[in-house]
Amino acid sequence: MEFRPCIDIHNGKVKQIVGGSLKDSGDQAQENFVSEQDAAFYAALYQKNKLKGGHIILLNSYDSPYYEETQKQALAALPAGGLQVGGGITPENAGDYLNAGASHVIVTSYVFREGRIDYDRLERLVYVVGRERLVLDVSCKRVGEKYLVVTDRWQKLTEEIVNESLLEK
């Protein structure tokens, strides 16, 4: 078994939130834990302990007043460990994270429009960052007997069913 470390940043703080409680309105979330340390502290700790394959997730929406502070923390943490980074990733800002030391960028919301994958947007990201440095997050929620991809900080269900056909695309 491998341990994959994660750093979630919300409202400028590293924290663990209660799953599904994140709301864009008012930048709210129920919290399990809020750290006194910043993202760079945890990135250095993970590197010191040789933990690989981790990621940093910016939990505020791109248009949140907290996004810029969250982004600064993520960028400061990246040189310490070559982590993956996700949250508000677009073709316009993906290079900033990769140039700062991210091993990959993680994307979901940008490539989904009106409940479906927008393959033009996905191809644009592939063109900008390269297929080998792009992670398409297909986080999902069970609805009946199916698992549907969920986007926008786990707030919006899509029409995309997670199955073999989707994963092969």
Which residues make up each language-model segment?
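Glycine-rich, proline-tolerant flexible connector loops at the mouths of alpha/beta enzymes
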Residues: L51-E69, S109-R116
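Alpha-helix-loop-beta-strand connector modules within alpha/beta enzyme cores
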Residues: S64-Q84, L122-S139
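Short catalytic helix/loop segments, enriched in acidic residues and glycine
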Residues: G20-A44
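Active-site loop-to-helix "anion-binding N-cap" substructures in soluble metabolic enzymes
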Residues: A43-Q47, Q73-A74, A80-Q84, G88-I117
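Conserved anion-binding
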Residues: H10, Q16-S25, L98-K169
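Catalytic domains of carbohydrate-active enzymes, especially glycoside hydrolases
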Residues: F41-I57, A100, K169
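Glycine-rich, positively charged N-terminal anion/phosphate-binding segment
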Residues: S35-Q47, S64-K72
